From Swiss-Prot:
The gene is thiE. InterPro entries: Aldolase_TIM, ThiamineP_synth_sf, ThiamineP_synth_TenI, TMP_synthase. GO terms for biological process: thiamine biosynthetic process; thiamine diphosphate biosynthetic process. This is Thiamine-phosphate synthase. It comes from the Bacteria.
Length: 237
């Protein structure tokens, strides 16, 4: 059986006009830091995207690179996003910016992701125009608000506690079940502590799209890790 990532690569070899990357078709969303302490962002991104990642977001907050070198300044963030964009073009994927509407516009990224306490949506929309905007949600009321407001997708979680968001309580899979029961047509992603071992439980709860971090960023073979997750998501469709 062909995996989604294999079909995407096959299509790229036989078509002279690549299909535009699509939020609607996106199922595997990766958040990565700039990997400054490793210096391998380009190779890592290429491997993860080749494995089937559909959206790759740069989020450097709390990263080893931040601890070693300090916060990622705007110019450096834009440079890192350009590295991701180059890889994303090769693999027909989308690039996302965390929090910063100005950085999204300056870098040309297709996606801006906002938390509950970030820039107001109306202001963000004025800055980024018709780019894709996503929203983090942590309870049912926030998810229902995201369905109603002018965002293009939303994330639901954390499903499990995660070091990416220290101190944040995890509403768990009950929230995933509640959101799945809403039967919204707006794309949404489960997030928080998800890996290949936990993904079946997330799928059983009703999610069909997920955001991962360490499941790929900490993997010895990022491409293989992405392929495994993408294959599991494909099988659940």
């Amino acid at each position: 059986m062909w995996s989604r990532s294999s079909l995407r690569r096959l299509t790229a070899t036989v078509s002279t006009v690549p299909e535009s990357p699509s939020l609607q078709g996106a199922r595997l969303y990766l958040c990565t830091d700039a990997r400054r302490e490793r210096g391998d962002l380009a190779d890592f991104a290429d491997a993860a995207l080749a494995g089937g990642v559909d959206i790759i977001q740069l989020r450097d907050k709390g990263s080893p690179g931040e601890k070693a070198f300090g916060p990622l300044e705007a110019r450096a963030e834009i440079d890192a996003l350009h590295v991701l964009a180059e890889a994303a073009r090769r693999h027909n994927a989308l690039v996302a910016v965390n929090d910063r509407a100005d950085i999204a516009r300056a870098s040309g990224a297709e996606v801006l992701h906002l938390g509950q306490d970030d820039l107001p949506l109306t202001v963000a929309r004025q800055i980024v125009g018709d780019r894709v905007i996503g929203r983090s949600t942590h309870d049912l009321a926030q998810a229902e608000a995201a369905i109603a407001e002018d965002v293009d997708y939303f994330c639901v979680g954390p499903c499990w506690p995660t070091p990416t968001k220290p101190g944040r309580a995890a509403p768990g899979l009950d929230l995933v079940r509640e959101v799945a029961a809403l039967n919204t047509t707006k794309p949404w992603f489960a997030i928080g502590g998800i890996d290949a071992q936990r993904l079946p439980d997330v799928l059983d709860a009703g999610a069909r799209r997920v955001v991962v971090v360490r499941a790929i960023t900490a993997a010895e073979d990022p491409r293989a890790a992405a392929e495994q997750l993408a294959g599991m998501l494909d099988s659940a469709v």
